[in-house]
Amino acid sequence: MRKTLLPLLAVFALPLAHAASDGQKQADDFTKLYSSTCFAYLPELGKLTEKLADFPPVPEEDAQNFLRGYNGKAWIVPHEPENYIIAVMPEHEHCALYAYHADAARVEKQYLDFVKKPPEGFTAEPYEDTHDTTDGIKTHTITYQWKASDSEDKPTFMLTTSTDPQSKIQAMISVAILAKD
């Protein structure tokens, strides 16, 4: 399944059109980076780890905030006006990208445009759509799964956004391959 998924994933990792405003560009850059890293390398996260080796690592004590208790590594991806953080957890086939600030509405639109159009042979199914408040910070999480009748693997995509200026992370997008229930 992973060998057939790789070429399909590459098709979806194409660059996005140039945006008109800074907010749009910021969201587009976030989505483009996700597409060319976590998504494009999902079946082979070890190769992504090799490509990220030249980027500055997040210090180990801080990396745990991005790894969510899993084994893996996190890197700082230089970007103007702010850097991104990418966390790769190969043992769990899980990759996540974090933005300190993002245009939540545009990131959500791009995410939904993407996950609702799976490659041929897959269906897209909404899994979760929740609004939460933690420590006074409001977040919105949207999760989709792609399913194929001939595979036990389910690429699962999750986006969490916040429009709260006090939020330390305003966008987090991740992908993991989960086994069927």
Regions found by a protein language model. Give the residues of each.
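Broad, structure-driven detector of short, well-ordered beta-strand segments within folded domains
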Residues: 78, 82-89, 153-163
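Bacterial N-terminal signal peptides
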Residues: 7-15
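Long, charged/polar, surface-exposed segments that mediate recognition or autoinhibition
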Residues: 79-141
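Positively charged n-region of N-terminal signal peptides that target proteins for export
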Residues: 1-4
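Glycine-rich, aromatic-bearing surface loops/beta-hairpins
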Residues: 136-181
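N-terminal leader/targeting segments
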Residues: 20-85
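Processing junctions and N-termini across compartments
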Residues: 13, 31-32, 89
